[in-house]
Amino acid sequence: MKQNRRNFLGQIGLAGIGLSFSAALAGCYQRNRGPALNLYTWDTYVGKHTLADFEKASNSHVNISLFANNDELFAKLRDGNPGYDVIVPSNDFVERLHQAGSLLELDHARIPNMANIDARFLNPLFDPGRKVSVPYTWIVTGIGYRKSKVDGVPDSWKWVLDSDKYKGRIGLLAEASELFEIGAKYLGLPANTADVATLARIEAMLIKQKPNIAAFHDDNGQDLLLAGDVDLVIEYNGDIAQVMREDSDLAFVVPREGGILASDGLCIPKGAPNPDLAHQFINFLLDGHNSAHVSETIRYPTPNRAALALMPAEYRNNPVIFPPAAILAQCEYSHFQGQIIQSAYEQAMTRVRAS
């Protein structure tokens, strides 16, 4: 079954709720349902029974809202927290939100299951000491493709950024900073290169490529690929791994120039109605069994050692979920470089899409 938003919400028992939870966000307690936890996250990003299990364990109620990309998440919090308790930004947006003063410092004493996290993820440059974020997944961006529709393996970003061979059959990410970082990798530059000349060069390339693009997608590239709307799409490894279980004609590759690495984190925004329950939820997600259930559902690599030990070999040895070290060596993390650079990315992307 296609893992679109409505199917996924149905699987976790929330199909009738929809995307807007403004009524739930108006308060933090629901009559006869216990305190409410308001979660703002990506689509297909919890286990099928994760939320029900937490509700039972904590005598609480979870409201889930979905965002399509980090830009949407940041915009929602720019003028203050509208009522969320836990959010799930990517590493560069953890940095951006922290600099904006939007994140609550975590009380590690209330998150003892952080002991399950691999030490490699505990002191990143974007959040030294993990003061405001807890690692949830890590991610590699590459190209998802339909094997029967392309000639060989699309092992270069050229296939999607600088070629008309698959005109009208290509999907690109809509998130400005990441698309321009990928453009820099294709040009042989560090991903975070953002000088005026480089941004202009990437913008011109994308404008030239735009007639060949079927869609700029908001984290639903796997759905486009599965439905046959595109044959090549820039997407995250976990999303493509999800649909590869449903269609053996689909595959994923990290281009030889290297991809973009990311680490999504669990954060509590300032002004959270229920920070105590938020800490409890984060600790619940970091339990080995609970984290393993999430990983089995969403197919992203886990930074949780206890969860990894519980996962089957099919997951642990899957090169889409865990690309080989030689491939990862060519990949880079993106970094928030300040509002001036971020605005330059966004303005350039606006011009590309308007061209």
Q: Where are the model-predicted features located?
A:
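N-terminal export signals
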Residues: 7-27
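Early extracytoplasmic/lumenal segment of secretory-pathway proteins
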Residues: 29-96
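Extracytoplasmic ligand-binding site segments that recognize negatively charged/polar headgroups
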Residues: 83, 88-229
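A ligand-binding cleft/hinge motif common to bilobed small-molecule-binding domains
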Residues: 93-98, 226, 232-249
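Periplasmic-binding protein-like
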Residues: 139, 199-208, 214, 244-270
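A bilobed periplasmic-binding-protein/Venus flytrap-type ligand-binding module shared by bacterial periplasmic
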Residues: 144-149, 185-186, 262-275, 282, ...
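Mature extracytoplasmic/periplasmic domains
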Residues: 269-329
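Conserved C-terminal helix/tail region of periplasmic/extracytoplasmic solute-binding proteins
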Residues: 325-355
